[in-house]
A protein has these predicted regions:
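Soluble non-cytosolic domains of exported or imported proteins
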Residues: 31-38, 55, 68-73, 107-111
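A short amphipathic beta-strand at an alpha->beta junction
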Residues: 125-137
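Surface-exposed aromatic
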Residues: 58-66, 91-106
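N-terminal, intrinsically disordered, polar/charged segments of Gram-positive cell-envelope systems
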Residues: 1-52
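Short, non-transmembrane amphipathic alpha-helical segments
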Residues: 78-81, 86, 111-128
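Mature extracytoplasmic domains of secretory-pathway proteins
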Residues: 56-80, 84-85
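Envelope-exposed proteins and targeting segments
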Residues: 40, 44, 78, 86-90, ...
């Protein structure tokens, strides 16, 4: 009987550690993504404030700042909309033409995948074939 209790305790510890690891993954990923966007914007703001930079380069820098800000807003909106569909947590990463969605927990159902694709295509103007959905449990 002691062995059973020890095994149960060990299983509970493993479940707790997995949950913490998954929670940390989403927290750290969100922090890294926000830091990356902030650094990109800061780099473009440096270009804008540099007196040795041409007006054409400044225009491109301003367009990039706007694009990054719009992308950040679209990601935030999409993540929040997807959470209203019952997904506990998720991360959206946009890389050139592809959108990677990492969903917390079990593999999403066909219905959840369709809802995620619908929201991503609408909010991020992505094509369905460019949306890649995975889970992290």
């Amino acid at each position: 009987e002691e062995t059973d209790e020890a095994e149960i305790q060990e299983e509970n510890t493993l479940e707790t550690n997995t949950k913490i690891t998954t929670d940390e993954y989403f927290t750290n990923s969100r922090l890294e993504r926000n830091t990356m966007y902030s650094q990109q914007i800061e780099n473009y703001q440096d270009i804008l404030s540099n007196t040795n930079v041409s007006e054409a380069q400044k225009k491109v820098a301003q367009e990039e700042i706007t694009r990054i800000s719009n992308e950040q807003n679209a990601i935030m909106i999409a993540e929040n909309l997807i959470k209203t569909k019952g997904i506990e947590d998720l991360m959206i990463f946009v890389n050139n033409e592809s959108v990677n969605v990492i969903v917390k927990g079990n593999e999403p159902t066909k219905e959840e995948i369709a809802q995620i694709q619908n929201i991503i295509t609408r909010e991020l103007n992505a094509d369905i074939e460019d949306i890649h959905i995975m889970n992290k449990s």
